[in-house]
């Protein structure tokens, strides 16, 4: 009799990594990456604004405060997904939305809250100029190209279990399919003359085959593909025939038939078909 830890170690010593396969990104939740994923692009691709506000040259805002705003001339506006055609020069500003590329000449973004835009709108003044209420520093509210993921860098490591956040990363890299480890096929076989399939009427003295469904659900829960072999009756020929149906599976789980009773034939059949590495485990219940 061996411990649970020893049993797991022995079982895992027979385990090999399964072959990779490509899976559509939308179907990859819970799958395991088969290889490292490298980025072909910068994320973000260009320097862009982290705030809604005004793209400016920081030195144009020197000394700005709520009591002494710096007035800049507005020369354009740019939204996310577009490139500004104008160039920011000293004393000018471009109204910019979050995610929009930083216009040429700008080195800072002053958020709307640090301008007098709302005051000007309330006074129904045309937005040809803007008052800056706080001095900016170079790089303020700018996300640099490649700040999140740089081109050529590893974005995700092999062996990563894909969660929604990793799927989002892969989508941001333009990956519509990903290399993942094939899901193991796990054959599930219940044994016993007392068992009845849940689709059948229940005769006196019999019980429904519940273990198969519980085990299959566990297989699915942990990423496997259950293959239901049904019920094998308590005789060697029937059990051998059922076990042979699992030859194309990666793993076989049997339920019952492993004690020392006259009808417990699983051990004998397995010994005839292969090698029994261990049999009893020190655990309760067991």
Locate each region found by the language model.
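Short, low-complexity N-terminal leaders and the immediately following helix N-cap/first helix
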Residues: 1-68, 95
């Amino acid at each position: 009799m061996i411990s649970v830890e020893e049993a797991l170690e022995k079982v895992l010593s027979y385990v090999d990594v399964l072959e990779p396969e490509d899976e559509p990104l939308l179907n990859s939740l819970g799958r395991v990456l088969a290889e490292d994923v490298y980025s072909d692009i910068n994320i973000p691709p260009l320097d862009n604004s982290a705030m809604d506000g005004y793209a400016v040259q920081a030195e144009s805002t020197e000394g700005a405060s709520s009591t002494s705003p710096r007035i800049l001339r507005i020369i354009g506006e740019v939204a996310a997904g577009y490139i500004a055609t104008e160039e920011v020069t000293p004393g000018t500003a471009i109204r910019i939305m979050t995610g929009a590329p930083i216009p040429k000449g700008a080195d800072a973004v002053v958020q709307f809250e640090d301008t007098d835009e709302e005051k000007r709108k309330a006074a129904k003044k045309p937005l040809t100029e803007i008052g800056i209420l706080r001095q900016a520093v170079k790089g303020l509210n700018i996300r640099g190209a490649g700040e999140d993921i740089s081109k050529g860098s590893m974005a995700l490591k092999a062996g990563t279990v894909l969660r929604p956040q990793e799927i989002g990363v892969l989508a941001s890299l333009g990956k519509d399919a990903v290399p993942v480890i094939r899901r193991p096929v796990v054959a599930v076989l219940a044994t016993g003359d007392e068992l009845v399939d849940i689709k059948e009427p229940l005769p006196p003295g019999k019980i429904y085959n519940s273990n198969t469904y519980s085990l299959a659900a566990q297989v699915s829960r942990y990423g496997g593909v259950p293959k239901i072999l049904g019920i094998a009756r308590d005789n060697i020929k029937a059990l051998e025939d059922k076990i042979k149906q699992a030859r194309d599976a990666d793993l076989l789980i049997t339920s019952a038939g492993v004690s020392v009773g006259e009808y417990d034939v699983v051990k004998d059949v397995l010994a005839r078909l292969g090698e029994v590495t261990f049999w009893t485990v020190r655990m309760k219940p067991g």
